[in-house]
């Protein structure tokens, strides 16, 4: 039986070999087609690898061809690397694996195509000093049959903040306490006043971006100032921790609404346009118990949680701030003290603002909108207790004031209360709130009478007419139900989030004055 199977196998192999020999390949004459003549790799930070980009190569002729050489023009010195139809090319550095620079005799059947995948890791020093572009070519063939596809990448220099590693173990920073009151840590490092590469890490400016790996921690008794125009990019599972007794000051300034040149921006480190509104790319900014913060003109986007505020004794002051596309919560507060003015938060997995286990919260002229694709999300959640295994383990008084605010979203109820105490104190004054409790467990709950009966100048279930929710534009147009429905005493002498004065009485509800939608 074994002899028979062996003979069958040999016969198949001989037949296959005989068929394969019928494929005759002639040298390419330079008539290849390409899916594009230039491959633009989006902006990358110095020494950080890019995403992978694709080029498709077509043989439109009726003949099988062999391309004598596919190579990068800069050869082994190129900062680009390729795979060609799964091949890694010649092993120029004797590593045992092709280095993705040079490929000999690449075969391509008639009327067929192949894929080339391209990546780069380049240093700012490799780029053109006038425009910071790093370029090369993919060359196909040679001599009179030579064809080229250009490669272009913009390189950005940056300050890099990352934990040290010793024998495979990363440096860590204090994060909290476990159930036995032991200190827990996460991967990261403390900022330094005299870092050997970055200099004073307690003053972040706009000369070049900051890229954070792990958690950048502001130590006790230290202050981090992030000044106008600064750009901060966080890698996956990275963020910032402000320790007990430390201070965070974000000092952005009014900017052009498109250029945002003086705005401070926190976002992920993937610079390709595709990632500009992808939630959950990095961790959070964690303001620990005993920390303090003043935040002005910050745009924070694509985090898991934007601001995570734990039981702070001082007041966290937030104004003129936008928080977008968080996969969990925009601002997650636990027994915290927060004041907010001109804050706009759009779309989060669970809530745009969650004030939990009590605390003191005061928001004026803020817009909370949640259009996350989930039936359980809300715009604002207020809660005064914590349960573990169905046992209440903590509770605190809640004091929450919302004045001239929009609380809206795609679900029928955008405001949710969850209380166990009688000192659950809320005031909503001249707010636009989406609240349709018909058929829900909230029907008849007296805590919601203020909006159910539209008391205290509040209005319910009317459309604020945001400009463009999908693109995080929460400006309101001239037909908005929020136009002229605010209480002017909360507005007098102030500017809206765009920097326009609130001078018309009655004022508009939310972070923005009404405006006319610009024509395309």
Give a label for each model feature.
Residues 25, 35-43, 48-49, 56, ...:
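Beta-strand/loop edge motif enriched in small/polar residues
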Residues 20-40, 60-119, 124-126:
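Surface-exposed binding patches on compact interaction domains or structured appendages
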Residues 476-477:
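Polyanionic/metal-chelating signatures
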Residues 15-18:
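C-terminal motif of bacterial Sec signal peptides marking the signal peptidase cleavage site
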Residues 1-6:
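Positively charged n-region of N-terminal signal peptides that target proteins for export
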């Amino acid at each position: 039986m074994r002899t028979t199977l062996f003979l069958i196998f040999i016969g198949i192999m001989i037949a296959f070999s005989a068929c394969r020999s019928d494929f005759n390949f002639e040298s390419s004459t330079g008539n290849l087609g390409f899916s594009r003549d230039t491959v633009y790799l989006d902006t990358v930070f110095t020494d950080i690898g890019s995403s992978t980009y694709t080029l498709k190569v077509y043989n439109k002729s009726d003949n099988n061809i062999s391309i004598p050489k596919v190579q990068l023009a800069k050869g082994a010195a190129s900062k680009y690397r390729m795979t060609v139809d799964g091949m890694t090319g010649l092993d120029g550095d004797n590593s045992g694996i092709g280095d993705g620079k040079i490929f000999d005799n690449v075969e391509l059947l008639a009327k067929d195509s192949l894929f080339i995948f391209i990546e780069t890791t380049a240093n700012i020093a490799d780029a053109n000093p006038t425009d910071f572009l790093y370029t090369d070519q993919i060359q196909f063939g040679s001599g009179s049959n030579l064809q080229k596809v250009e490669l272009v990448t913009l390189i950005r220099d940056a300050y890099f903040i990352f934990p040290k590693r010793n024998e495979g173990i990363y440096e860590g920073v204090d994060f909290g306490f476990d159930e036995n009151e032991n200190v827990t840590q996460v991967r990261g490092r403390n900022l330094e006043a005299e870092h050997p590469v970055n200099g004073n890490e307690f003053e972040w400016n706009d000369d070049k971006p900051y890229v954070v790996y792990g958690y950048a921690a502001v130590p006790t008794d230290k202050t981090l100032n992030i000044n106008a125009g600064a750009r901060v990019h966080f890698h996956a599972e990275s963020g910032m921790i402000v320790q007990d007794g430390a201070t965070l000051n974000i000092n952005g300034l009014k900017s052009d609404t498109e250029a945002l040149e003086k705005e401070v921006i926190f976002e992920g480190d993937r610079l390709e346009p595709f990632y500009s509104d992808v939630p959950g790319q990095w961790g959070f900014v964690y303001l620990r118990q005993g920390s303090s913060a003043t935040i002005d003109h910050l745009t924070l986007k694509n985090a898991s949680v934007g601001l995570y505020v734990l039981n702070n004794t001082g007041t966290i002051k937030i104004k003129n701030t936008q928080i977008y596309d968080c996969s969990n919560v925009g601002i997650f507060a636990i027994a915290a003290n927060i004041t907010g003015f001109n804050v706009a938060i759009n779309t989060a997995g669970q809530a745009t603002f969650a004030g939990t286990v009590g605390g003191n919260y005061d928001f004026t002229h803020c817009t909370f909108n949640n259009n996350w694709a989930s039936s359980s999300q809300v715009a604002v959640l207020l809660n005064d207790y914590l349960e573990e295994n169905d046992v209440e383990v903590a509770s605190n008084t809640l004091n929450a004031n919302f004045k001239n605010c929009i609380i809206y979203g795609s679900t029928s109820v955008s405001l949710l209360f969850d209380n166990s105490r009688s000192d659950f104190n809320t005031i909503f004054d001249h707010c636009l709130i989406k609240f349709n409790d018909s058929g829900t467990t909230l029907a008849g709950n007296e805590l919601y009478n203020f909006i159910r009966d539209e008391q205290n100048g509040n209005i319910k279930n009317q459309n604020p007419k945001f400009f463009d929710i999908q693109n995080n534009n929460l400006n309101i147009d001239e037909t908005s139900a929020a136009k002229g429905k605010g209480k002017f005493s909360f507005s007098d002498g102030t500017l809206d989030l765009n920097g326009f004065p609130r001078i018309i009485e009655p004022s508009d509800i939310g972070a923005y004055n009404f405006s006319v939608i610009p024509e395309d």
